[in-house]
Amino acid sequence: MLDKGFGIDRVAVGAGIGVNETAKWRPKWKIEKYDGDMNLYAVEEFEGNLLLNEGITELLKLLIGTTATAFNNTNAYIGVGNGTTAAAAGQTGLVGTNKAYKPMDATFPQVSGQTVTFRAAFGPDDGNYDWREFTVANGNSDSAKNLNRAVENHGSKAQGDTWIVQLEVTIS
């Protein structure tokens, strides 16, 4: 006679004491489109962007006071380009063939509560091509540290038009 028996006893004890902190990054873009006579003809809004690794690193350096370039009125620029490649965290700026970076308008960026607002004007001779990608950088080119990148088609800017781009980011 062959007798077999199998048995498994398992006891597990654990304490699930964990702290989970989260922060939400909520970007909201706005483009005001003016014709050559400065008549407003369209306002377009969209949400979202991807934080770029180089921008995150620059923010962390600023947070702890190490050497970094601030995203302030002297250094911050909004960039627009015609790139259509999906945003990826490892990118280091705009990817399109045509691109332009414009400095902040006077008094920008601004902070109110938990929201920072960046704003720049693209005048009659600036950025006259398809607008498909957007960024905020701490300099006037892709070699600066780009904070973020958004990809969305907002049409072609015509010679003579002025488009004002604004980004509000709320962190909560």
Which role does the model predict for each range below?
Residues 1-131, 138-172:
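Small cysteine-rich, disulfide-bonded extracellular modules of the LU/uPAR three-finger superfamily
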